[in-house]
């Protein structure tokens, strides 16, 4: 039965934490259609399909998340030459989902609306599968502030464009604000894993989540621009002073929803450019491809390390 009451809004931070839903209406439903996943509780046995899941990694594109499942499969010794990973969400072109062992890999598209839809259905999937002790990590790309391209940022706090650690949504015409808490212990574990790998620079910092790639992030090269270069530089410098080290478009709702539903969550993104020095991503494709593999390698190593201690 779904969690209800005022206390349900506060996710506990301990090691034995079931996935919870903050919606009493779910308990009244005879069938739940996860439309964007092409899965339904009447046709699919969620505990049999997903009950062993302990780690979920989400990222923007289907191809990147398929590459990740291959990466983690190899790291865990579960991959073999020629093995294919079928898309569990075949039949819909909205999201892609792959699984190997206790690891689920899901694409979420770009921006808050797209990842929000995915998270609603993903969290319900984990709930119906009776999963517990689930760690969920967003891996992706971002624009850095004051960092060399290729630097990996582990998010300490997801902040909005006013540098506040909260996610605001309009629900039935009213403002609803949720905290964007991330698991501090998980941040330190990931940072230690990066030090053990010793392959690339990794820092901990705040991540600013915006509603747009162009004006929302202070770019000067969009179809619209209502500010000067001086305005842009002043804003980015203020962000840096507030502890922001990278910018993307998903972390705030990701942190808010995962925290509320009892999921240990982290965000690990590589920076593709230093926004204090420009707006356009101009590195060669092969360089960008290697950058994008860095969060995958770090998180794969982390998962292997955690499973070896289980």
Curated annotation (Swiss-Prot):
Pathway: Pyrimidine metabolism; UMP biosynthesis via salvage pathway; uracil from uridine (phosphorylase route): step 1/1. Keywords: Glycosyltransferase, Transferase. Its EC number is 2.4.2.3. This is Uridine phosphorylase 1. Gene3D superfamilies: Nucleoside phosphorylase domain. Phosphate binds at residues 60, 94, 138-141. It comes from Homo sapiens. GO terms for molecular function: deoxyuridine phosphorylase activity; identical protein binding; thymidine phosphorylase activity; uridine phosphorylase activity. One of its GO terms (biological process) is UMP catabolic process. Pfam families: PNP_UDP_1. Uridine binds at residues 142-143, 217-219. Belongs to the PNP/UDP phosphorylase family. PROSITE patterns: PNP_UDP_1 (PS01232). InterPro entries: Nucleoside_phosphorylase_CS (IPR018016), Nucleoside_phosphorylase_d (IPR000845), Nucleoside_phosphorylase_sf (IPR035994), Uridine_phosphorylase_euk (IPR010059). One of its GO terms (cellular component) is nucleoplasm. It is an enzyme of class 2 (transferase). Homodimer. Induction: By vitamin D3 and a mixture of inflammatory cytokines: TNF, IL1/interleukin-1 and IFNG/IFN-gamma. PANTHER family: URIDINE PHOSPHORYLASE, URIDINE PHOSPHORYLASE 1. Catalyzes the reversible phosphorylytic cleavage of uridine to uracil and ribose-1-phosphate which can then be utilized as carbon and energy sources or in the rescue of pyrimidine bases for nucleotide synthesis. Shows broad substrate specificity and can also accept deoxyuridine and other analogous compounds. It comes from the Eukaryota.
């Amino acid at each position: 039965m779904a969690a209800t009451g005022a206390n349900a809004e506060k996710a506990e931070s301990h090691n034995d934490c079931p996935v919870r839903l903050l919606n009493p209406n779910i308990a009244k439903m005879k069938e739940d259609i996860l439309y964007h996943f092409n899965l339904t509780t009447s046709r699919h046995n969620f505990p049999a399909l997903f009950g062993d899941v302990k780690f979920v990694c989400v990222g923007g594109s289907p191809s990147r998340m398929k590459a990740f499942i291959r990466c983690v499969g190899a790291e865990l010794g579960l991959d073999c030459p020629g093995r294919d990973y079928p898309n569990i969400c075949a039949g819909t072109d909205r999201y892609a989902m792959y699984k190997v062992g206790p690891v689920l890999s899901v694409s979420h598209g770009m921006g808050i609306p797209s990842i929000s839809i995915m998270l609603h259905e993903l969290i319900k999937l984990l709930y119906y599968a009776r999963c517990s002790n689930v760690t969920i990590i967003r891996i992706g790309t971002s624009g850095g502030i004051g960092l060399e391209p290729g630097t990996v940022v582990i998010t300490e706090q997801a902040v909005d464009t006013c540098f506040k650690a909260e996610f605001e949504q309009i629900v039935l015409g009213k403002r609803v604000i949720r905290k964007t808490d991330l698991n501090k212990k998980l941040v330190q574990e990931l940072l230690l894993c990066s030090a053990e790998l010793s392959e690339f620079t990794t820092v901990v910092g705040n991540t600013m989540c915006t509603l747009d790639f162009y004006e929302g992030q202070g770019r000067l090269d969009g179809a619209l621009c209502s500010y000067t270069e001086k305005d842009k530089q002043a804003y980015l410098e203020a962000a840096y002073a507030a502890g922001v080290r990278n910018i993307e478009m998903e972390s705030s709702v990701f942190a808010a929803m995962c925290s509320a539903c009892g999921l240990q969550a982290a965000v690990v993104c590589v920076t593709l450019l230093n926004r204090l020095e420009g707006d356009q991503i101009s590195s060669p494709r092969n360089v960008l491809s290697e950058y994008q593999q860095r969060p995958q390698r770090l998180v794969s190593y982390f998962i292997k390390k955690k499973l070896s201690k289980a």
